[in-house]
Amino acid sequence: MAKKMIMPVAWAQDVDCWLETLKAAGFSDDTVRSRRYKIARLCRELPSPMETTGEQITRVFAAHDWKPETRKGYRNTIAGFYRWFYETGRRGDNPTAKVPKVKKPQAHPHPCPDKYILMALGKATEDERRMIRLAAECGLRRSEIAAVNSDDVMDDLLGKSLIVRGKGDKQRIVPCPDDLAAEIQACGGYLFPGRWSGHVEASYVGKHITRLLPDGWSAHSLRHRYATRTYESTHDLYLVSKLLGHSSVETTQIYVAMPDSRLRAGMSAVTLQA
Protein backbone atom coordinates (compact mmCIF):
# COMPACT_ATOMS: atom_id res chain seq x y z
CA MET A 1 0.00 0.00 0.00
CA ALA A 2 1.20 3.52 -0.73
CA LYS A 3 0.26 4.82 2.75
CA LYS A 4 -0.10 3.08 6.08
CA MET A 5 -3.69 3.55 7.26
CA ILE A 6 -3.88 4.91 10.82
CA MET A 7 -5.52 2.42 13.19
CA PRO A 8 -8.15 3.79 15.63
CA VAL A 9 -6.98 3.43 19.24
CA ALA A 10 -10.01 1.32 20.22
CA TRP A 11 -8.99 -1.35 17.70
CA ALA A 12 -5.20 -1.15 17.73
CA GLN A 13 -4.31 -3.72 20.41
CA ASP A 14 -6.75 -6.39 19.21
CA VAL A 15 -5.82 -5.92 15.56
CA ASP A 16 -2.11 -6.19 16.40
CA CYS A 17 -2.77 -9.49 18.21
CA TRP A 18 -4.78 -10.80 15.25
CA LEU A 19 -2.06 -9.83 12.78
CA GLU A 20 0.47 -11.67 14.93
CA THR A 21 -1.56 -14.87 14.49
CA LEU A 22 -1.46 -14.38 10.70
CA LYS A 23 2.32 -14.01 10.82
CA ALA A 24 2.57 -17.09 13.03
CA ALA A 25 0.48 -19.02 10.49
CA GLY A 26 2.98 -18.17 7.76
CA PHE A 27 1.08 -15.51 5.83
CA SER A 28 3.36 -13.35 3.69
CA ASP A 29 4.27 -9.79 4.69
CA ASP A 30 2.26 -8.46 1.74
CA THR A 31 -0.84 -10.35 2.90
CA VAL A 32 -0.48 -9.11 6.48
CA ARG A 33 -0.03 -5.51 5.28
CA SER A 34 -3.09 -5.85 3.05
CA ARG A 35 -5.24 -7.21 5.90
CA ARG A 36 -4.07 -4.43 8.21
CA TYR A 37 -4.92 -1.77 5.63
CA LYS A 38 -8.41 -3.17 5.05
CA ILE A 39 -9.31 -3.64 8.72
CA ALA A 40 -8.00 -0.14 9.53
CA ARG A 41 -10.12 1.40 6.79
CA LEU A 42 -13.25 -0.42 7.93
CA CYS A 43 -12.90 0.18 11.67
CA ARG A 44 -12.56 3.94 11.13
CA GLU A 45 -16.30 3.82 10.41
CA LEU A 46 -17.17 1.54 13.34
CA PRO A 47 -17.17 1.76 17.16
CA SER A 48 -14.94 -0.56 19.22
CA PRO A 49 -14.61 -4.30 18.44
CA MET A 50 -16.90 -5.13 21.37
CA GLU A 51 -19.59 -2.61 20.41
CA THR A 52 -19.72 -3.19 16.65
CA THR A 53 -22.86 -4.93 15.38
CA GLY A 54 -23.58 -6.83 12.21
CA GLU A 55 -25.99 -4.10 11.11
CA GLN A 56 -23.29 -1.46 11.45
CA ILE A 57 -20.85 -3.51 9.38
CA THR A 58 -23.53 -4.06 6.74
CA ARG A 59 -24.21 -0.31 6.56
CA VAL A 60 -20.50 0.39 6.03
CA PHE A 61 -20.42 -2.05 3.11
CA ALA A 62 -23.63 -0.61 1.65
CA ALA A 63 -22.15 2.91 1.72
CA HIS A 64 -19.21 2.04 -0.53
CA ASP A 65 -19.28 1.58 -4.30
CA TRP A 66 -16.62 -1.13 -4.35
CA LYS A 67 -15.98 -3.56 -7.17
CA PRO A 68 -16.99 -7.16 -6.32
CA GLU A 69 -13.42 -8.39 -5.78
CA THR A 70 -12.63 -5.40 -3.54
CA ARG A 71 -15.85 -5.89 -1.58
CA LYS A 72 -15.07 -9.57 -1.16
CA GLY A 73 -11.58 -8.75 0.12
CA TYR A 74 -12.90 -6.38 2.77
CA ARG A 75 -15.57 -8.84 3.89
CA ASN A 76 -13.07 -11.69 4.16
CA THR A 77 -10.80 -9.45 6.22
CA ILE A 78 -13.33 -8.36 8.83
CA ALA A 79 -14.86 -11.85 8.92
CA GLY A 80 -11.40 -13.29 9.61
CA PHE A 81 -10.79 -10.78 12.39
CA TYR A 82 -14.09 -11.49 14.13
CA ARG A 83 -13.74 -15.24 13.72
CA TRP A 84 -10.45 -14.97 15.64
CA PHE A 85 -12.03 -12.49 18.11
CA TYR A 86 -14.83 -14.97 18.86
CA GLU A 87 -12.70 -18.13 18.95
CA THR A 88 -10.23 -16.58 21.41
CA GLY A 89 -13.04 -15.75 23.85
CA ARG A 90 -12.83 -12.00 23.49
CA ARG A 91 -16.49 -11.80 22.54
CA GLY A 92 -19.43 -14.18 22.86
CA ASP A 93 -20.76 -13.73 19.34
CA ASN A 94 -19.52 -13.07 15.81
CA PRO A 95 -21.21 -9.96 14.34
CA THR A 96 -20.10 -10.83 10.79
CA ALA A 97 -22.16 -14.04 10.80
CA LYS A 98 -25.17 -12.18 9.43
CA VAL A 99 -23.32 -9.77 7.15
CA PRO A 100 -24.39 -10.61 3.56
CA LYS A 101 -21.88 -12.66 1.63
CA VAL A 102 -20.50 -11.11 -1.53
CA LYS A 103 -21.73 -12.67 -4.74
CA LYS A 104 -18.81 -14.23 -6.55
CA PRO A 105 -18.26 -12.24 -9.75
CA GLN A 106 -18.17 -14.03 -13.08
CA ALA A 107 -14.54 -13.45 -13.99
CA HIS A 108 -13.28 -13.62 -17.56
CA PRO A 109 -9.77 -13.98 -18.99
CA HIS A 110 -8.17 -10.66 -19.87
CA PRO A 111 -4.88 -11.36 -21.67
CA CYS A 112 -3.03 -8.26 -22.82
CA PRO A 113 -2.43 -8.32 -26.61
CA ASP A 114 1.21 -8.69 -27.63
CA LYS A 115 1.10 -5.46 -29.65
CA TYR A 116 0.49 -3.46 -26.46
CA ILE A 117 3.26 -5.30 -24.63
CA LEU A 118 5.74 -4.61 -27.44
CA MET A 119 4.73 -0.94 -27.44
CA ALA A 120 5.32 -0.80 -23.69
CA LEU A 121 8.73 -2.44 -24.02
CA GLY A 122 9.68 0.18 -26.61
CA LYS A 123 9.32 3.04 -24.13
CA ALA A 124 10.31 1.23 -20.91
CA THR A 125 13.44 1.73 -18.84
CA GLU A 126 15.71 -1.28 -18.30
CA ASP A 127 14.06 -2.06 -14.95
CA GLU A 128 10.56 -1.65 -16.39
CA ARG A 129 11.45 -3.90 -19.32
CA ARG A 130 12.48 -6.63 -16.88
CA MET A 131 9.25 -6.19 -14.90
CA ILE A 132 7.17 -6.56 -18.05
CA ARG A 133 9.07 -9.64 -19.21
CA LEU A 134 8.80 -11.35 -15.82
CA ALA A 135 5.02 -10.90 -15.95
CA ALA A 136 4.45 -11.67 -19.64
CA GLU A 137 7.10 -14.37 -20.23
CA CYS A 138 7.33 -15.98 -16.77
CA GLY A 139 3.80 -15.37 -15.41
CA LEU A 140 4.88 -13.76 -12.14
CA ARG A 141 2.61 -11.74 -9.86
CA ARG A 142 3.54 -8.16 -8.93
CA SER A 143 4.73 -9.22 -5.47
CA GLU A 144 6.79 -12.04 -6.98
CA ILE A 145 8.43 -9.69 -9.48
CA ALA A 146 9.32 -7.27 -6.68
CA ALA A 147 11.13 -10.02 -4.75
CA VAL A 148 13.18 -11.58 -7.59
CA ASN A 149 16.78 -12.19 -6.46
CA SER A 150 19.91 -13.30 -8.30
CA ASP A 151 19.97 -16.40 -6.08
CA ASP A 152 16.61 -17.47 -7.55
CA VAL A 153 18.09 -18.43 -10.93
CA MET A 154 18.92 -22.11 -11.38
CA ASP A 155 20.05 -24.42 -14.16
CA ASP A 156 17.62 -27.04 -15.45
CA LEU A 157 18.14 -29.76 -18.06
CA LEU A 158 17.32 -27.43 -20.96
CA GLY A 159 18.32 -23.95 -19.81
CA LYS A 160 17.51 -21.60 -16.96
CA SER A 161 14.65 -21.58 -14.49
CA LEU A 162 13.51 -19.23 -11.76
CA ILE A 163 12.58 -20.19 -8.20
CA VAL A 164 9.46 -18.15 -7.42
CA ARG A 165 8.22 -17.50 -3.89
CA GLY A 166 4.49 -17.04 -4.20
CA LYS A 167 1.49 -16.60 -1.95
CA GLY A 168 1.82 -18.22 1.46
CA ASP A 169 5.55 -18.62 0.87
CA LYS A 170 4.84 -21.46 -1.56
CA GLN A 171 7.68 -22.05 -4.00
CA ARG A 172 7.46 -23.05 -7.63
CA ILE A 173 9.91 -23.27 -10.51
CA VAL A 174 9.21 -21.61 -13.86
CA PRO A 175 11.30 -21.58 -17.05
CA CYS A 176 13.08 -18.28 -17.68
CA PRO A 177 14.51 -16.99 -20.99
CA ASP A 178 18.31 -17.30 -20.90
CA ASP A 179 18.97 -13.62 -21.57
CA LEU A 180 16.60 -12.51 -18.82
CA ALA A 181 18.09 -15.06 -16.42
CA ALA A 182 21.57 -13.68 -17.16
CA GLU A 183 20.40 -10.15 -16.30
CA ILE A 184 18.92 -11.37 -13.02
CA GLN A 185 22.12 -13.21 -12.08
CA ALA A 186 24.22 -10.16 -12.89
CA CYS A 187 22.37 -7.94 -10.40
CA GLY A 188 23.99 -9.66 -7.38
CA GLY A 189 21.02 -9.47 -5.03
CA TYR A 190 17.49 -8.16 -5.46
CA LEU A 191 16.71 -7.28 -9.05
CA PHE A 192 14.64 -4.33 -7.82
CA PRO A 193 16.23 -3.20 -4.54
CA GLY A 194 14.34 -0.91 -2.17
CA ARG A 195 15.50 2.62 -1.47
CA TRP A 196 16.87 1.77 1.98
CA SER A 197 16.85 -2.02 2.21
CA GLY A 198 15.12 -5.16 0.94
CA HIS A 199 13.18 -4.90 -2.31
CA VAL A 200 10.51 -2.63 -3.78
CA GLU A 201 6.82 -3.21 -3.00
CA ALA A 202 4.33 -4.93 -5.29
CA SER A 203 2.48 -1.63 -5.78
CA TYR A 204 5.68 -0.08 -7.17
CA VAL A 205 5.90 -2.79 -9.83
CA GLY A 206 2.21 -2.49 -10.66
CA LYS A 207 2.34 1.28 -11.11
CA HIS A 208 5.34 1.14 -13.43
CA ILE A 209 3.83 -1.55 -15.65
CA THR A 210 0.34 -0.01 -15.77
CA ARG A 211 1.81 3.39 -16.68
CA LEU A 212 3.31 1.88 -19.84
CA LEU A 213 0.21 0.00 -21.01
CA PRO A 214 -2.95 1.45 -22.59
CA ASP A 215 -5.94 2.16 -20.34
CA GLY A 216 -7.65 -1.00 -19.15
CA TRP A 217 -4.51 -3.13 -19.09
CA SER A 218 -2.40 -3.95 -16.04
CA ALA A 219 0.41 -6.17 -14.79
CA HIS A 220 -2.17 -8.85 -14.05
CA SER A 221 -3.30 -8.90 -17.68
CA LEU A 222 0.27 -9.86 -18.62
CA ARG A 223 -0.08 -12.87 -16.33
CA HIS A 224 -3.30 -13.74 -18.17
CA ARG A 225 -1.36 -13.46 -21.41
CA TYR A 226 1.24 -15.91 -20.09
CA ALA A 227 -1.47 -18.38 -19.07
CA THR A 228 -3.29 -18.14 -22.39
CA ARG A 229 -0.16 -18.53 -24.51
CA THR A 230 1.12 -21.45 -22.44
CA TYR A 231 -2.19 -23.29 -22.66
CA GLU A 232 -2.44 -22.63 -26.40
CA SER A 233 0.98 -24.25 -26.81
CA THR A 234 0.58 -27.21 -24.42
CA HIS A 235 -3.19 -27.80 -24.02
CA ASP A 236 -2.30 -28.81 -20.44
CA LEU A 237 -4.36 -26.85 -17.89
CA TYR A 238 -2.73 -28.65 -14.97
CA LEU A 239 0.71 -27.56 -16.17
CA VAL A 240 -0.46 -23.95 -16.53
CA SER A 241 -1.91 -24.10 -13.02
CA LYS A 242 1.43 -25.23 -11.58
CA LEU A 243 3.37 -22.57 -13.48
CA LEU A 244 1.04 -19.85 -12.18
CA GLY A 245 1.24 -21.12 -8.60
CA HIS A 246 -2.49 -21.82 -8.29
CA SER A 247 -3.77 -24.32 -5.75
CA SER A 248 -6.80 -25.07 -7.94
CA VAL A 249 -7.20 -25.65 -11.68
CA GLU A 250 -10.58 -23.92 -11.32
CA THR A 251 -8.75 -20.67 -10.62
CA THR A 252 -6.52 -21.18 -13.65
CA GLN A 253 -9.56 -21.42 -15.94
CA ILE A 254 -10.26 -17.75 -15.21
CA TYR A 255 -6.85 -16.84 -16.65
CA VAL A 256 -6.97 -18.83 -19.89
CA ALA A 257 -8.72 -17.22 -22.85
CA MET A 258 -9.95 -19.31 -25.74
CA PRO A 259 -7.36 -18.94 -28.55
CA ASP A 260 -8.54 -16.58 -31.28
CA SER A 261 -7.60 -19.15 -33.93
CA ARG A 262 -10.10 -21.64 -32.50
CA LEU A 263 -12.83 -19.00 -32.25
CA ARG A 264 -12.24 -18.04 -35.87
CA ALA A 265 -12.33 -21.70 -36.88
CA GLY A 266 -15.70 -22.01 -35.17
CA MET A 267 -16.99 -18.93 -36.99
CA SER A 268 -15.84 -20.34 -40.34
CA ALA A 269 -17.69 -23.58 -39.67
CA VAL A 270 -21.04 -21.82 -39.19
CA THR A 271 -20.70 -19.15 -41.91
CA LEU A 272 -23.41 -19.57 -44.55
CA GLN A 273 -22.09 -20.30 -48.02
CA ALA A 274 -23.98 -18.93 -51.04
Short names for language-model regions:
Residues 1-7, 270-274:
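C-terminal secondary-structure termini that scaffold catalytic or DNA-interacting sites
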Residues 2-3, 16-108:
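N-terminal core-binding DNA-recognition domain of tyrosine recombinases/integrases
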Residues 5, 168, 244, 249-269:
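Catalytic-site neighborhood detector that most strongly recognizes the C-terminal catalytic loop/helix
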Residues 91, 103-119, 168-179, 191:
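DNA breakage-rejoining catalytic core of tyrosine-based enzymes
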Residues 91, 106, 112-142, 146, ...:
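Basic, Lys/Arg- and aromatic-enriched nucleic-acid-binding interface segment
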Residues 133, 137, 225-247, 254:
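C-terminal catalytic core of tyrosine-transesterase DNA break-rejoin enzymes
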Residues 147-184:
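Conserved tyrosine-mediated DNA breakage-rejoining catalytic core shared by Y-recombinases
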Residues 177-216, 220:
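Active-site/catalytic core of tyrosine-dependent DNA strand-transfer enzymes
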